[in-house]
A protein has these predicted regions:
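A conserved helix-loop-beta module that forms one wall/lid of the active-site cleft
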Residues: 31, 35-36, 73-138
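Protein kinase-like catalytic core scaffold
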Residues: 126, 159, 181-182, 221, ...
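Phosphate-binding site of ATP-dependent enzymes
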Residues: 137-216
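A long amphipathic alpha-helix within ATP-dependent nucleotide-binding catalytic cores
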Residues: 189-234, 238, 246-264
């Protein structure tokens, strides 16, 4: 089958070794594998001429997500499914669905400006972030009213999320099909560039991952977990993450994509 990866330009601008290895393995399975960055092309979307049987959405840009929506609308297969990616990328819909799935997650509010969240500080610190952000972009820890009144927020809706105290590290949970890994990384805006260290995945985390996989309809995804004194809290879900720090994830990623491509 023809499989095309919709990629993003990384920083630094070098291909992901994990994605490259997954592509190589898919080729050995008999697939014809290509990949390109949607922002580098002039893409007609009212009439599509597909060049692949399955598109793998690796990029999280708005352009790539919209193009995946156009592909989906024409009945062209996308992995992960477009609707699942759209739900995960929008923190409003993701948070609501996690509550429905009984996945522990912080209280969350949708706001139009930072100043609308002032009253929330009466009960403690909050996190402000874009409603469609990823990789920690635009995330702010707010502890005082002055931070909100002086904050220069990006255009568009924002999320105010109750701050969850933790050990100073995020637990990054990565999933490919039924396989679950966990990696601990320091919590800061550059954490996505670090590999972190692989750690044991306990049964509670496995159960959370299984609920998200089933409820969202995702096959390749990650979630950010804060290990709070009251138990784990999921603060974000991302489709097709980087899998940095996972022990040899490429074969499992390739096998998952192969299974989706073959419809099994």
């Amino acid at each position: 089958m023809r499989i095309c990866f919709l990629l993003t330009r990384r920083v630094p601008d070098v291909p992901s070794p994990i994605v490259l290895e997954a592509q190589r393995l898919l080729g050995r399975m008999g697939h014809e594998v290509t990949g390109w960055i949607p922002e580098d092309r002039l893409l007609r979307t009212d009439v599509l001429t597909p060049e692949a049987d399955l598109y793998v959405l690796k990029s999280h840009t708005e352009l790539a997500l919209s193009y995946a929506g156009a592909l989906h609308g024409q009945g062209i297969a996308v992995c992960n499914e477009y609707g699942a990616c759209l739900t995960a990328q929008d923190k409003v819909t993701a948070g609501r669905l996690m509550r429905e799935l009984r996945v522990p997650t912080p209280e969350t509010w949708l706001i139009g400006s930072p100043q609308q969240a002032i009253e929330l500080l009466a009960e403690g610190p909050i996190i402000i972030k874009p409603h469609r952000g990823h990789r920690g972009a635009g995330l702010h820890l707010i502890e005082e009213v002055a931070q909100l009144t002086s904050m220069q927020a990006p255009p568009g809706p924002l999320i105010a999320q109750r701050y969850v105290p933790g050990p100073g590290e995020d637990l990054k949970v990565y999933v490919a099909g039924e396989n679950v890994w966990a990696v601990r990384k320091p919590f800061d805006p550059q954490s996505f560039t670090r590999f972190g260290r692989s750690v044991h995945v306990d049964e509670e985390i496995k159960d959370i991952a299984a609920r998200i996989r089933s409820g969202f309809g995702l096959e390749l995804f990650g979630c950010d977990v804060i290990e709070s004194p009251d138990g784990p809290r999921v603060v974000d879900v991302n489709y097709f993450p980087g899998y940095k720090g996972c022990p040899d994830p490429a074969p499992v990623i390739a096998a998952t994509i192969d299974r989706v491509a073959r419809g099994s």
